[in-house]
UniProtKB/Swiss-Prot annotation:
Known function: Ligates lysine onto the cytidine present at position 34 of the AUA codon-specific tRNA(Ile) that contains the anticodon CAU, in an ATP-dependent manner. Cytidine is converted to lysidine, thus changing the amino acid specificity of the tRNA from methionine to isoleucine.
Protein name as catalogued: tRNA(Ile)-lysidine synthase
Top-level taxonomy: Bacteria, Pseudomonadati, Pseudomonadota, Gammaproteobacteria, Enterobacterales
Gene name of the record: tilS
Similarity annotation: Belongs to the tRNA(Ile)-lysidine synthase family.
Record Pfam families: ATP_bind_3, TilS, TilS_C
Length: 460
C-alpha cells in the first residue's frame, strides 16, 4: 500500500495527537469514503509511527440495503489486505418510534458498545460536513446549547471513550486524500434519497450555502464549539447545586428546586436526568415534569415518561425509575423446613431463593441481615408480594394498616409491591430489608436466622 507522504500529514498528525497513549482501537468501518480514509490513516500510523498499535474494525450490517452483503465482502477484503481483524455484526432495525435514521444509529452504537474490548477506544469517521448537518438538524428541532453543541471530538463512551479524529476536515479533503492514495470505497445509493433529513441537507441545502458562503461549515463548527463551551461552563457551575439537591438514592429535592429561578431549575433538571442516563428532554417535557409531577397536589401519585424512564414524586423528591419487570405471581413456595443431620428438632437452613422480575436473591445467612425466629421443622416457608391487612411490627405497640406502615417507614409506592414478604406457614415474618413482625421476632439468648436480600442496586 502507499505510505502517507508529507502532504497528507494534515490528516495524520492530528490523528496521532488525538490517540495519545491509546494503543488499542476499534474503528467503525462501513466501507464508505470516510471510514476507509480513517482506517487507512490508522494503518499508516501503525507502519510509520506506532508499530504496537492494535487495530480492530467493526462493520454493522443493518439489513436495509440489497447491497449490504456485498458491502460486507468489500470490507472483509479491505481488512484482509491491510491485516486488520474485522468483526461483522448484524442488527435489527425498528424504525417505528423515531424513524429509520435514528433507529439505525441507535442499533449501530449499541453494537459498538457491546463489542468494545476492555482497553479499546472507539473511533468513528464523522467529518466537518457531518458536523454542519448535525448542527442544522438540531437547529431545526429547536435545540438549546446542548443540542447545538453537535458532536464532540472526544467523549465518554461505554467503559471507554469515543474519538472522532476527522471532525475538523471536510469531505472534500477526505476525498482528495482517498484519490491520492488510490483507495477503493463503496457508495451507498440510499445517500441520494432526500426523503431522509441528512440527505436533504447534504444534497439540497448545503451546496447552496457553501456556494454563497464557502466557509459556512467551518463557521457552524465554531458555533457548535461555543455552545459546547457554554454547556461545559454550566456543568461546572451547577455541579455543586445538583449535588446538594440530590439524596443518597439520587432523588432530587423539589423544595430545593423551588428556590431556583425557572432557567436554573430547568438546567438542573436536565443535568439530573442526564446523570441518570435519561435521554435529553424537550422543553415541553421539562415543563410537564415540573407542573404535572413536581407541582401536583400532595395526595396525588404523578408520573411522567421520558424515553423508557419514568419520573415519579415521593415526599417532595423526584425519582427517575428504570423500566420495572412485571411480577407475575404473588406467591413463591421456598422450602419445607427439614431437620439438621443427627437431630429431629433443629431446623436446617433452606437453599437461597431466586426472586422473579429481576428482584435478586433471598437467603438465610449466619450473621447480618434481619434477625428472625427460626422456622420449625416441617413448617412451610414462602415468599409473597403485596402487603395487606393490619400489621404488628417489632418496635411498635399497636397494629397498623399496611398502607400506614409503608408510609411511616418512608417506602415509595412503586417499591411496596416489589418488596418480598417472608412467611412461615400463614404467618408474616418479615418484609425483606424493611421490618420484622412481632410474630417473626427472634427471642433473646436463643438461636435465630438472619434473612439477607441480595437485591439490585435500584429497585426503582
Amino acid at each position: 500500500m502507499n505510505l502517507v507522504t508529507s502532504k497528507p500529514n494534515v490528516l495524520l498528525n492530528p490523528l496521532f495527537a488525538q490517540l495519545g497513549e491509546n494503543r488499542h482501537v476499534l474503528v467503525g468501518f462501513s466501507g464508505g469514503l470516510d471510514s476507509t480514509v480513517l482506517l487507512h490513516l490508522l494503518v499508516c500510523l501503525r507502519q510509520q509511527l506506532i508499530p504496537e498499535l492494535n487495530i480492530r474494525a467493526i462493520h454493522i450490517h443493518h439489513g436495509l440495503n440489497p447491497q449490504a452483503d456485498s458491502w460486507v465482502k468489500h470490507c472483509m477484503q479491505q481488512c484482509d489486505q491491510w491485516k486488520i481483524e474485522l468483526k461483522v455484526v448484524r442488527v435489527n432495525i425498528d424504525p417505528r418510534q423515531n424513524g429509520i435514521e435514528a433507529a439505525a444509529r441507535t442499533a449501530r452504537y449499541q453494537a459498538f458498545s457491546a463489542n468494545l474490548a476492555a482497553k479499546e477506544v472507539l473511533l468513528t469517521a464523522q467529518h466537518l460536513d457531518d458536523q454542519c448537518e448535525t448542527f442544522l438538524l438540531a437547529l431545526k428541532r429547536g435545540s438549546g446549547p446542548a443540542g447545538l453543541s453537535a458532536m464532540a471530538a472526544k467523549m465518554p463512551f461505554a467503559h471507554s471513550q469515543l474519538l472522532r479524529p476527522l471532525l475538523a476536515f471536510s469531505r472534500e479533503i477526505l476525498e482528495n486524500y482517498a484519490q491520492a492514495q488510490q483507495l477503493q470505497w463503496i457508495e451507498d445509493d440510499s445517500n441520494q434519497d432526500d426523503r431522509f433529513d441528512r440527505n436533504f441537507l447534504r444534497l439540497n441545502v448545503l451546496p447552496i450555502l457553501n456556494q454563497r458562503w464557502p466557509h459556512f461549515a467551518q463557521a457552524t463548527a465554531r458555533s457548535a464549539g461555543l455552545c459546547a463551551e457554554q454547556e461545559q461552563l454550566l456543568d461546572e457551575l451547577l455541579a455543586e447545586n445538583l449535588q446538594q439537591l440530590q439524596g443518597p438514592d439520587r432523588s432530587l429535592s423539589i423544595d430545593g428546586l423551588l428556590q431556583a429561578s425557572m432557567a436554573k431549575r430547568a438546567a438542573i433538571l436536565r443535568r439530573w436526568l442526564a446523570s441518570l442516563g435519561a435521554p435529553m428532554p424537550s422543553q415541553s417535557q421539562l415543563q410537564r415534569l415540573w407542573l404535572e409531577v413536581a407541582m401536583a397536589r400532595q395526595d396525588a401519585e404523578p408520573q411522567l415518561m421520558i424515553g423508557t424512564r419514568q419520573v415519579r414524586r415521593f415526599r417532595q423528591h423526584l425519582y427517575l425509575l428504570m423500566p420495572l419487570a412485571e411480577i407475575t405471581t404473588n406467591y413463591l413456595p421456598w422450602a419445607t423446613v427439614k431437620a439438621a443431620p443427627n437431630s429431629s428438632i433443629i431446623p436446617l437452613l433452606p437453599e437461597p431463593l431466586w426472586l422473579p422480575a429481576d428482584l435478586g436473591v433471598l437467603r438465610f445467612v449466619s450473621a447480618g441481615g434481619q434477625a428472625v425466629r427460626p422456622a420449625a421443622v416441617g413448617e412451610e416457608i414462602s415468599v409473597r408480594f403485596g402487603l395487606q391487612g393490619d400489621i404488628k411490627i417489632v418496635g411498635r405497640h399497636h397494629s397498623r394498616q399496611s398502607k400506614k406502615v409503608w408510609q411511616e417507614l418512608g417506602i415509595p409506592p412503586w417499591q411496596r409491591e416489589r418488596i418480598p414478604l417472608l412467611y412461615f406457614g400463614e404467618q408474616l415474618i418479615a418484609a425483606a430489608g424493611v421490618f420484622v413482625t412481632q410474630a417473626g421476632q427472634a427471642n433473646e439468648n436463643e438461636p435465630c436466622w438472619h434473612l439477607d436480600w441480595d437485591k439490585p442496586l435500584r429497585l426503582g
